[in-house]
Design a protein with these regions (language model features):
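Active-site core segments that coordinate phosphate-bearing ligands/cofactors
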Residues: 1-128, 137-161, 168-180
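Glycine-rich Rossmann NAD(P)(H)-binding loop
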Residues: 131-132
Length: 180
């Protein structure tokens, strides 16, 4: 029941083995937060694409000198989300600039992604993660993901619909074995 409450689903592979998938849609939350930041700090909607990781700021976040106050606005408050963000202290107006508030958003979204990934991973020894979608171009996200997933191999793909493509390749391979 815990998996279902956190939107982690179990599927059956073509080899009759259980495959877990944790569905997590960060894009809508990101769009919502960017819109809010753009409004507060009077920035163009594409301004965030110019932001590189601020290593000093990130270091302060990791060692607790800066508290992460991000709180998701559009993501369902599942038990996992409630564990990560027990209270809503998110107020982007208190940050000195767009960049600081943006790093808070990406910090929170990265933590959500990592928790979702680890939920799906369960006890599996897998240490290779494939990432596709719009976040592969977000350098702050990638930097934080590498830190939170130290010991994992991260592969990034620009290929659209990578999961669907991977499934299609697997089915094609299986069909070819039966036909030949």
């Amino acid at each position: 029941i815990s998996d279902l409450q956190n939107d982690c689903l179990n599927f059956l592979s073509i080899h009759s083995k259980t495959v877990k998938a944790s569905r997590f849609f960060l894009g809508y939350e990101m769009d919502h937060q960017l819109s809010r930041l753009n409004q507060i700090f009077k920035k163009d909607e594409r301004y965030y694409k110019k932001i590189n990781p601020d290593l000093t700021l990130i270091s302060k976040m990791f060692d607790g000198r800066i508290e992460n106050t991000f709180y998701p606005a559009t993501i369902e408050k599942s038990p996992m989300v409630k564990d990560l963000f027990p209270e809503d202290k998110w107020n982007p107006e208190v940050y000195a600039n767009y960049e600081e508030a943006y790093h808070q958003v990406i910090w929170g979204l990265t933590r959500l992604q990592v928790a979702s990934l680890k939920l799906a991973q369960g006890n599996s020894p897998i240490r290779k993660v494939y990432i596709d979608g719009g976040f592969v171009h977000n350098q702050v996200f990638i930097h934080l993901l590498r830190h939170f997933l130290e010991g994992y191999t991260l592969e990034f793909s620009d290929f659209p619909l990578g999961s669907a493509y991977g499934a299609a390749l697997m089915l094609e391979e299986t069909n070819n074995k039966f036909i030949n």
